[in-house]
């Protein structure tokens, strides 16, 4: 996505009613993901592992988008994605990770991801996720 395309998209997303859950054990990555989501006007919350993400949904939480790390303690992203899909959760899940060989990426996708991006997440990569998952704001 070019800089002009990003600039063109930002005003449309600023009015967004989208919600996102950031699932990552790294404070640095949590902060980056939150800043990018905030920049696009997407309300977001953060949890530090897959079990916490599952617990949020078990408690009635619901989000349009989940940004899921793969490598986390307690319950990793693959396990959490599988569990959420087994629960019938239809939120779009994008895997966002630094560590992914082809086998791991395939396993993560097969767990129920809708998209996958390598870290570091950038505004362009986030907009790519939103477009691929058909999150468009009607103006």
UniProtKB/Swiss-Prot annotation:
Mostly expressed in flowers and siliques, primarily restricted to pollen grains. Disruption phenotype: No visible phenotype. The modification 4-aspartylphosphate is found at residue 69. Two-component system major event consists of a His-to-Asp phosphorelay between a sensor histidine kinase (HK) and a response regulator (RR). In plants, the His-to-Asp phosphorelay involves an additional intermediate named Histidine-containing phosphotransfer protein (HPt). This multistep phosphorelay consists of a His-Asp-His-Asp sequential transfer of a phosphate group between first a His and an Asp of the HK protein, followed by the transfer to a conserved His of the HPt protein and finally the transfer to an Asp in the receiver domain of the RR protein. Keywords: Cytokinin signaling pathway, Nucleus, Phosphoprotein, Transcription, Transcription regulation, Two-component regulatory system. GO terms for biological process: cytokinin-activated signaling pathway; phosphorelay signal transduction system. The keyword Mitochondrion does not apply. PROSITE patterns: RESPONSE_REGULATORY. Residues 19-134 form the Response regulatory domain. SMART domains: REC. SUPFAM superfamilies: CheY-like. GO terms for cellular component: nucleus. Gene3D superfamilies: 3.40.50.2300. It is found in: Nucleus. Pfam families: Response_reg (PF00072). Belongs to the ARR family. Type-A subfamily. Functions as a response regulator involved in His-to-Asp phosphorelay signal transduction system. Phosphorylation of the Asp residue in the receiver domain activates the ability of the protein to promote the transcription of target genes. Type-A response regulators seem to act as negative regulators of the cytokinin signaling. This is Two-component response regulator 24.
